[in-house]
Amino acid sequence: MNRIILFFLSLISYCAYSNTYIGIEYGYGAVNHDYKVNYIQDGVSLDPDISNGKVSLFGGYQFTEQFSLEFGYSFFKFEDDYSRTIGTISDSGRDYIHEREWDARVNADQFYIAPAFSFYFDGQKKWKANIKTGVTYTQYHSKSMSYDQYEYILNDDIEFMINRHSNERKNNEIGFLIGTGVDYNIYDNLWLGLSISYQIDEFSDSTLAGVSANYRF
């Protein structure tokens, strides 16, 4: 009986600190990966880099004032391209500018789960430091292609393309992430934050600085 009472009191204490939160984050930084595309005969090498940053949606359940479990989804992509003017050609009485294009890109969908720890460092509980570390699952879709583009000299809306080469592959990778940052309670249950994170798996690793907003219920 005493154990049940103690458990019940512990549960009440635990629930007093329990709440959920949702948020959005934008990050940008440096990325390394193993997807390099070399067109040896053309003398062209492509090394896709992160474009438009990394957008993340996240949510979590705060078990205590210091500990929560967070889930998130992120989308990001790497891109690189190169073009070269070959010359002009005539076809059906029209003159066209002949350009050769090379393109390589990677689209990534990432999911993560991470325990997170928070610590207030002011008396009013407006500022807090965060650290999280967890596991990622990322689906990479890589695609490279080369094609010839012919654009009518007198009207660039008239054009056609001929594919020279295309290749694609998919990778599913388990990885690791760690991140830290600070949040500020700007209004009521709304928090704004700055963060830095590092993520690594067999396909890529990244170091990103981010800004975020989250709402706690």
Q: Where are the predicted features?
A:
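Cleavable N-terminal export/targeting peptides
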Residues: 1-21
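Short glycine/proline- and aromatic-enriched beta-strand/turn motifs that initiate or cap beta-hairpins
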Residues: 16-63, 69, 75, 111, ...
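Repeated loop/turn-to-beta-strand initiation elements of outer-membrane beta-barrel proteins
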Residues: 20-22, 66-71, 124-127, 184-192
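Residues on the lipid-exposed face of transmembrane beta-strands in outer-membrane beta-barrel proteins
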Residues: 24, 57-61, 73, 113-119, ...
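Extracellular/periplasm-exposed beta-strand and loop segments of Gram-negative cell-envelope proteins
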Residues: 31-52, 75-110, 138-173, 198-200
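Predominantly the C-terminal beta-signal and adjacent terminal strand-loop region
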Residues: 76-82, 176-217
